[in-house]
Amino acid sequence: MSLNSEEDEAELVQLQPRYNGEDTSATTNRELNGWYAYPIAAEVFAVVAVGAFLPVILEQLARENGYFFSDSTKSCVDHGGSRRMRAEDGLKGSEQCMIKILNSTISTSSFAMYTFSAAVIVQAVTLVCFSSFADHGPYRKKMLMAFAYTGSVASALFIFISPTVYFLAPILVIVGVTSLGCSFVLLNAFLPLLVANHANNTGAKFATADSSSDFELEALNPNTQCGQSHARSAHMSSRGVGYGYMAAVFVQVISILILWLFSKTAIQKRHPSLPIRVILLLVGMWWAALTTPTLLWLRPRPGPPLPSQEAKTLSAPTSRFRTFLFYTRFSLRSFWRTLLRAISLRQTLMFLISWFLLSDAVATISGTAVLFARTELHMGTIAIALLSITSIGSGIIGAFAWPRVQKRFSLQPKTILLCCVAGMEMIPLYGLLGFIPLFKKLGFIGLQQPWEIYPVAVLHGIVMGGVSSYARSVYAPLIPEGSEAAFFALYAVTDKGSSAFGPALVGWLVDHAGSIRPAFIFLAVLVVLPAPLLWMLDVEKGREDAKAMADGEGRGRGTYERVREE
């Protein structure tokens, strides 16, 4: 990072402002470091907390208040001592633990699944209502900081959630997951601005007479500049993700050390949930502390005003509450208009439906795998943390490997997604092998032994690397030019909102079956559902339809097309 970043900034040519209040100052290394700092801060919560320990802590807190599925008189945890009662009095090791919530009896695994379904619904609604804050007005950075610190506090507060107040844990999970999703949407809203004001885009260093010809050539060949911007955007985005994953692996290793240290003491035997609560406190502190560089270095970069606000004058100020309501109404109207436009584009709609199903399947398998390892395979928290690291490491390998596979065999991005669906389908099918009598007699194959889940985690990570890398690549050509922000907002809501249904249905199945394993039947069906839609998807036809819509509407107005709608 340059110590003279402010001087460097002064030397860079600024773009002409497109609206009143736009910050067109050139992007500096200091600002880029501020943007990169946030994935390092927040990705730790996404991977370590959401991906590993939140499902475990929810199940553990509920278990300490629960009773066995086949005998409601026996507690799942012997409160008179430290001994677990899973196998006592002839009870099977796979016995599910049940708990009463609001006059309903659910399993402790379902308690975690239902909580995440509720969190996803709240997150999706919040994303829809707050989308205009990401694109318009001076609130982008303020909202980013608000969500970041709210989420970090929610994670840290788990240190106070003992089994006696376990019903407060879902509230903190919902707040944390919602804050995480909304903060990343707000962070991503900075990306096109940082790219647009990058030194190489603004004619870096000094504007001289000799450089005018370059600007003229660039104007005659806008696709070259567009391609450079897309490449730079992809590079910055991938670096942010890479930094975030490295930070997550680092904190996960620290978490394993914490769990190991607690396992050597008598504290864990008396308070089984305490080590995980300490880890969540650490994650919250990490999130808050590493957000500080973003707070200090990332410029606010105000967005364009909303259309109706352009006519307002300073002589007619509005209250904060009325401004909030105005932004929310605009967000809902904008989302509804974008949804109607997407419905009129057959190929775009087909992809969004397939992505809805695929995203739901991916999220459901991830959550179910952790709880299956916890309740059916009886794996400890250290083993689950190692499982998370295995999946993350494989995901990084997959992200690098799939492009090589695509280049080697000249595959289309859609084909890569179909390969990922096929790989994901192998996971529930392998779990179903545990129902076959021959394999049941062997005692392994079909996820009957803890070690079997690690190769499954490798497969899951590799497949996830492909899904994460190629879903946007397939979707991008299907968007009308000039509507990128609106359609990617729809993509984000489809991604986040879909994950509410699969976990809830798995929870319902577990409640009625008394075991997670039968849910593999549902997962096998859920994973394969998007495959026919992806197979029928005609990307070239979708590209032509999107271009025709943009030409018919006279668009091509860039990132801020929603500013001038209506």
UniProtKB/Swiss-Prot annotation:
Taxonomy of the source species: Eukaryota, Fungi, Dikarya, Ascomycota, Pezizomycotina
Main function: Vacuolar effluxer which mediate the efflux of amino acids resulting from autophagic degradation. The release of autophagic amino acids allows the maintenance of protein synthesis and viability during nitrogen starvation.
Topology in the lipid bilayer: Multi-pass membrane protein
InterPro entries, per database record: Atg22 (IPR044738), Atg22-like (IPR024671), ATG22/LtaA_families (IPR050495), MFS_trans_sf (IPR036259)
Chain segments carrying region Disordered: 547-566
Glycosylated residues, chain numbering: 103, 200
PANTHER family: AUTOPHAGY-RELATED PROTEIN 22, AUTOPHAGY-RELATED PROTEIN 22-2
Gene Ontology terms describing biological process: amino acid transmembrane export from vacuole; autophagy
Keyword Glycoprotein (UniProt): yes
Residues that span the membrane, as ranges: 38-58, 110-130, 146-168, 179-199, 242-262, 278-298, 351-371, 382-402, 416-436, 451-471, 488-510, 519-539
GO cellular component: vacuolar membrane
Family: Belongs to the ATG22 family.
Keywords assigned: Amino-acid transport, Autophagy, Glycoprotein, Membrane, Transmembrane, Transmembrane helix, Transport, Vacuole
Stated name of the protein: Autophagy-related protein 22-1
Subcellular location(s) per record: Vacuole membrane
